From Swiss-Prot:
Changing residue 469 to V: Produces lanosterol and achilleol A instead of cycloartenol. It comes from Arabidopsis thaliana (Mouse-ear cress). One of its GO terms (biological process) is thylakoid membrane organization. It is an enzyme of class 5 (isomerase). It holds the Pfam family SQHop_cyclase_C. One of its GO terms (cellular component) is mitochondrion. The lineage of its organism: Eukaryota, Viridiplantae, Streptophyta, Embryophyta, Tracheophyta. It catalyses: (S)-2,3-epoxysqualene = cycloartenol. This is Cycloartenol synthase. The active site is at 483 (proton donor). Keywords: Isomerase, Repeat.
Length: 759
């Protein structure tokens, strides 16, 4: 039976800054579990599989089953159900909150964070399996049980038409279909296995033009595997790393996720690396193409892309650029004396790869560059220490649920979820009853702050300061992020106001000052904050975005979410430390407020870039303005935002926004105008903060009624449609949102609407 392990090492090749706090990984133990436990797991798996085309999102039941066995669960309070004609009472809300918090406290890990699924994208696991296959480490790193669960996952998320999507809820794409078909083959499935599902997958690929129509990232992965030719790829010259930094196209000016993926890709392209040609690879050459492999027109293939994948079509300037590099520049760099420059570029690339690996304890900024960097380390030296240090960190990215084993979009969302959870629990005003939960969470926040900058000359490595920041996941990961720092700071400041007898010692003021320093340092000239770094180049750089599948990836843009979180954190900080860098804090807040107001859409909404979508963005937009004292009575911006939200409320009382809003940039309801507990909570939080209760409480009562009725028998909330997004077009799971935000919204509703009403 599988067991989730928390904050453990277990390998001499693991490095850590904080004794592995926040680390989460799954391990198989054949001796674990009673017959009843095993039956419960199998029932969860069967239920998911039977309903997989209706409910594509797993509910994280294996983790929940484990915690229900391990943690003492208090008797569940009676479930509350409210008729449409009934009034919502304070007692009903308090009972719902206690039921929700009683449950949520049972799935907290002993180190204080809430583990959970951060899967969703369907292109991550293939990169891992291709890399492990090439390096010969597949059977060393993954047990038979790992491989079995991965196959389960891939079959569970195959669409009815036989293909696979970019993410678990997406329609079939060539990128998803080819890579996941290849992954199943590398995991031991034959071309006709899976009760006909392999054949269905292959038919989808061939009926849509074959693997020559895969996206550029897919072409790269197939090329290193040996199932595609490098001449069928557009150039990714590593020489770009040798350009002077003042050029706007220097990779050091790009969004860190973009440059950190193209860094190892350029190394592999520069070397034209191809793995061992095995019998499976030779067979794939026959299975994936509509013509014999030796007859494929690789030059034509460079610019082919299936229409199903084309979110960001290449502009003409890009086609001209790639053709020039391919036909003129590359031939020069492949032979003497140009080869000397190529060798220098490759050395520069691997130097930067090692720096990234060492300063993330071999976790790396994300799963794509994690496996690419690992492959590059092996290509450089198959027996290297660097490659061995990479291997145990693979498990940090693997998550198991009833749908199988997936690769996550990060090594988790530990700090992010914990920061929100703390704010949600404090909003209920039930602090004393849940003191032990808050104390553990407080400890996690304190242990997860990044305490040092990366070593060396940060400019040389194109890195921003880190000291004082909070990361998205763990301190070992260590990349600083603006909104994670802000949410960590908000949580720390709120807890510092609670008696230390309940939540433990407050964080040292010096560390709070360092967090404020990070936030201020990340503000751009326009007042907005981007994610990891300052915006270092221009939006026109998207003209050379080679990734057909993703939008707005080349530079780090300022976002309403990051900017609003910074305002809220700095306002909270200023109340407690009014004298610290007063002028800079005031100016930062003022500029950020102007930025948020300037990017509001004409309909009153804000586009959310990191979750679905206008509901999420508008919650942040409103909260940023509310933090400086604006309400729907004194601010036309807030009033317009409230009008927008109220116009989207469903007859059920809730809100339900589809992920299609993200890619189309137009508000879309969920199918059948269904409501969603997370969207509903975001809308409620925005409206309550804006002062809706002073104007008309009815929409809030209706929303609260929907949330209360949605709560499950055990106090959990249901897992509904996917709610996270990145790069406009790819969805990602935030498993904790279904618990955090309904609790937060009902907490604020109880304290700021019902209790105020009673006074």
């Amino acid at each position: 039976m599988w067991k989730l392990k928390i904050a453990e090492g277990g390998s001499p090749w693991l490095r850590t800054t904080n004794n592995h706090v926040g680390r989460q990984f799954w391990e198989f133990d054949p001796n674990l579990g009673t017959p009843e436990d095993l039956a419960a797991v199998e029932e969860a798996r069967k239920s998911f599989s039977d309903n997989r085309f209706v409910q594509k999102h797993s509910a994280d039941l294996l983790m929940r089953l484990q915690f229900s066995r391990e943690n003492l669960i208090s008797p569940v309070l009676p479930q509350v159900k409210i008729e449409d004609t009934d009034d919502v009472t304070e007692e009903m809300v308090e009972t719902t909150l206690k039921r929700g918090l009683d449950f949520y406290s049972t799935i907290q890990a002993h180190d204080g964070h809430w583990p959970g699924d951060y899967g969703g994208p369907m292109f991550l696991l293939p990169g891992l399996i291709i890399t492990l296959s090439i390096t010969g480490a597949l059977n060393t790193v993954l047990s038979e049980q790992h491989k079995q669960e991965m196959r389960r996952y891939l079959y569970n998320h195959q669409n009815e038409d036989g293909g696979w999507g970019l993410h678990i809820e997406g329609p079939s794409t060539m990128f998803g279909s080819v890579l996941n078909y290849v992954t199943l083959r590398l995991l031991g499935e034959g071309p006709n296995d899976g009760d006909g599902d392999m054949e269905k997958g292959r038919d989808w690929i061939l009926n849509h033009g074959g693997a020559t129509n895969i996206t550029s990232w897919g072409k790269m992965w197939l090329s290193v595997l040996g199932a595609f030719e490098w001449s069928g790829n557009n150039p990714l010259p590593p020489e770009i790393w040798l350009l002077p930094y003042f050029l706007p196209i220097h990779p050091g000016r790009m969004w860190c996720h973009c440059r950190m993926v193209y860094l190892p890709m350029s190394y592999l392209y520069g070397k034209r690396f191809v793995g061992p040609i095995t019998s499976t690879v030779l067979s794939l050459r026959k299975e994936l193409f509509t013509v014999p492999y030796h007859e494929v027109n690789w030059n034509e293939a460079r610019n082919l892309c299936a229409k199903e994948d084309l979110y960001y079509p290449h502009p003409l300037v890009q086609d001209i650029l790639w053709a020039s590099l391919h036909k003129i520049v590359e031939p020069v760099l492949m032979r003497w004396p140009g080869a000397n420059l190529r060798e220098k570029a490759i050395r520069t690339a691997i130097e930067h790869i090692h720096y990234e690996d060492e300063n993330t304890r071999y976790i790396c900024i994300g799963p794509v560059n994690k496996v690419l960097n690992m492959l590059c380390c092996w290509v450089e030296d198959p027996n290297s220490e660097a490659f061995k240090l990479h291997l145990p960190r693979i498990h940090d990215f693997l998550w198991l649920a009833e749908d199988g084993m997936k690769m996550q979009g990060y090594n988790g969302s530990q700090l992010w979820d914990t920061g929100f959870a703390i704010q949600a629990i404090l909003a209920t005003n039930l602090v004393e009853e849940y003191g032990p939960v808050l104390e553990k969470a407080h400890s996690f926040v304190k242990n997860s702050q990044v305490l040092e900058d990366c070593p060396g000359d940060l400019n040389y490595w194109y890195r921003h300061i880190s000291k004082g920041a909070w990361p998205f996941s763990t301190a070992d990961h260590g990349w600083p992020i603006s909104d994670c720092t802000a949410e960590g700071l908000k949580a720390a400041l709120l807890l510092s106001k609670v008696p230390k007898a309940i939540v433990g010692e407050p964080i040292d003021a010096k560390r709070l000052y360092e967090a404020v320093n990070v936030i201020i340092s990340l503000q751009n000239a326009d007042g907005g904050l981007a994610t990891y770094e300052l915006t270092r180049s221009y939006p026109w750089l998207e003209l050379i975005n080679p990734a057909e599948t993703f939008g707005d990836i080349v530079i780090d843009y300022p976002y309403v979410e990051c900017t609003s979180a910074a305002i809220q954190a700095l306002i909270s900080f200023r109340k407690l430390y009014p004298g610290h860098r007063k002028k800079e804090v005031d100016e930062c807040i003022e500029k950020a407020v102007k930025f948020i107001e300037s990017i509001q859409a004409a309909d009153g909404s804000w586009y959310g870039s990191w979750a679905v979508c206008f509901t999420y963005g508008t919650w942040f937009g409103v909260k940023g303005l509310v933090a400086v004292g604006k309400t729907l009575k004194n601010s036309p911006h807030v009033a317009k935002a409230c009008e927008f939200l109220l116009s989207k409320q469903q007859p059920s009382g809730g809100w339900g926004e589809s992920y299609l809003s993200c890619q189309d940039k137009v508000y879309s309801n969920l199918d059948g105008n269904r409501s969603h507990v997370v969207n509903t909570a975001w809308a409620m939080l925005a409206l309550i903060g804006a002062g809706q209760a002073e104007v008309d409480r009815k929409p809030l009562h209706r929303a609260a009624r929907y949330l209360i009725n949605a709560q499950m028998e055990n106090g959990d909330f249901p897992q509904q449609e996917i709610m996270g997004v990145f790069n406009r077009n790819c969805m990602i799971t935030y498993a904790a949102y279904r618990n955090i935000f309904p609790i937060w919204a009902l907490g604020e509703y109880r304290c700021q609407v019902l209790l105020q009403q009673g006074e």
